């Protein structure tokens, strides 16, 4: 497991991420929520102390254990399934930051649960996420998250707990003298690539690999973002496209654990922006029901690319945070079905109303599910002026 020294460095990196991810500055008496799984309690304690010393008011929330979560979906009636505790909305309307410490004790405890029930609960809480999304657009809220090693994660990744811990430490630079300085370097290197991408007037992207032939429309008033402090680690650059122009075939060769279910080899075919054919070698019924959660669940909310020169992650980690940042031999691309990111809007985010989002093709959903492809691939940008530029090939941006 991570040492006390590594945990202290991890906390410093998370606080850097929290500050970097928010456009406005934190001030004394701001409210920051620390949400954590039970195995992450020590890191929560360290963060709690550091936030108090900063003059911040920490609000600590422990996630349900696997037994609690299973009981919730097994036993809850329709009203219990959509219940929101008193005070939750008030907290979300006043919160200034959130740090999530992901340390799952089980990845499969919800297998066998009706995916429709999981979706119903997610849809019922979506209004809370809408509140903090708006606060983020206004510059008064920021968030970050990380993952800690657990026996369950290591087992499903096919690693020992020591090997798994070492992978996390390496990916997050926790063995370096100053991990924060390392992240600042990555942040600056990524800024150069984002400037290059955003300097082109891109109309659409063509993604080609052995099993992918997909066209994605960039959309008006968009910008590439990423490596912004939100996720630790994060090496991806991404955009929320205009979902309406998506067409073609996509394949996720990276397995995925979601809501206690295991999914493998997902194949999606898009027509007129929506996934019309859905297949999976494992977990197909679950995938189908997740993508039927609401009207936006079968549409794209994100398109992402990871440069293998940035990421040290070269093994399957059984966790989306790491797997969506896979470097390996050919980097990765992923799409997310479901909700989009309004911070990829190139205009003033404070003026981004629900109506403007809809008109620009920003997808809206209670779902956000990253589906990762690690095949050798080429991504070609089709420019508004008619030209074409290969922007990504063999795992790296062609800058």
Regions found by a protein language model. Give the residues of each.
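Extended hydrophobic packing segments that form well-structured cores
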Residues: 354-399
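Long, well-ordered mid-to-C-terminal structural blocks that present hydrophobic/aromatic surfaces
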Residues: 242-295
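Active-site bordering "gate/hinge" segments
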Residues: 1-247, 388-391, 397-399
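Glycine-rich, charged/polar anion/phosphate-binding loops
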Residues: 130, 192-193, 201-203, 234-237, ...
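A short, compositionally biased
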Residues: 198-203, 262-264, 371-378
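Dual-mode signal for accessory low-complexity, basic/Gly-rich regions
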Residues: 275-346
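Short, glycine-/Ser/Thr-/acidic-enriched flexible segments
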Residues: 39, 104-106, 150, 212, ...
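A structural signal for short secondary-structure junctions
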Residues: 243-244, 259-262, 269-270, 294-298, ...
């Amino acid at each position: 497991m991570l040492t006390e020294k590594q945990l202290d460095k991890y906390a410093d990196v998370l606080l850097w991420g929290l500050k970097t991810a928010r456009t406005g500055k934190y001030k004394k008496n701001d409210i920051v929520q620390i949400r954590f799984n039970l195995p992450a309690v020590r890191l929560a304690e360290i963060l709690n102390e550091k936030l108090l010393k900063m003059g911040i008011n920490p609000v600590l929330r422990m996630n349900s254990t696997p037994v609690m979560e299973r009981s919730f979906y097994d036993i809850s009636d329709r009203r219990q399934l959509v219940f929101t505790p008193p005070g939750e909305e008030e907290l979300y309307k006043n919160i200034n930051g959130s740090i999530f410490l992901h340390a799952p004790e089980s990845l499969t405890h919800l297998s066998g649960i009706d995916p429709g029930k999981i979706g119903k609960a997610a849809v019922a809480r979506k209004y809370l996420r809408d509140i903090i999304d708006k606060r983020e657009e206004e510059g008064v809220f920021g968030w970050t998250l990380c993952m800690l090693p657990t026996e369950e994660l290591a087992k499903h990744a096919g690693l020992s707990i020591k090997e798994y811990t070492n992978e996390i430490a390496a990916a997050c630079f926790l063995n370096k003298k100053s991990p924060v300085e390392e992240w600042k370097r990555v942040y600056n290197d990524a800024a150069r690539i984002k400037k290059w991408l955003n300097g082109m007037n891109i109309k659409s992207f063509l993604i080609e690999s052995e099993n992918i032939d997909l066209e994605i429309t960039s959309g008006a008033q968009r910008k590439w973002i990423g490596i912004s402090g939100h996720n630790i680690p994060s090496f991806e650059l991404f955009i929320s496209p205009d979902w309406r122009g998506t067409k073609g075939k996509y394949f996720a060769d990276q397995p995925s654990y979601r809501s206690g279910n295991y999914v493998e080899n997902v194949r999606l075919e898009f027509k007129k922006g929506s996934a019309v054919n859905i297949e999976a070698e494992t977990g197909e019924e679950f995938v189908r029901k997740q993508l039927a959660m609401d009207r936006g669940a079968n549409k794209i909310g994100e398109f992402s690319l990871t440069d293998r020169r940035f990421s040290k992650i070269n093994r399957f980690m059984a966790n989306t945070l790491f797997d969506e940042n896979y470097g390996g031999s050919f980097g990765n691309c992923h799409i997310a079905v479901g909700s989009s990111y309004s911070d990829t809007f190139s205009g003033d985010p404070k003026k981004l109303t629900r109506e403007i989002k809809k008109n620009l093709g920003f997808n809206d959903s209670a779902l956000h599910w990253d589906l990762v492809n690690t095949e050798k691939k080429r991504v070609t940008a089709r420019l508004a002026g008619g030209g074409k530029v290969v922007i990504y090939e063999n795992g790296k941006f062609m800058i």
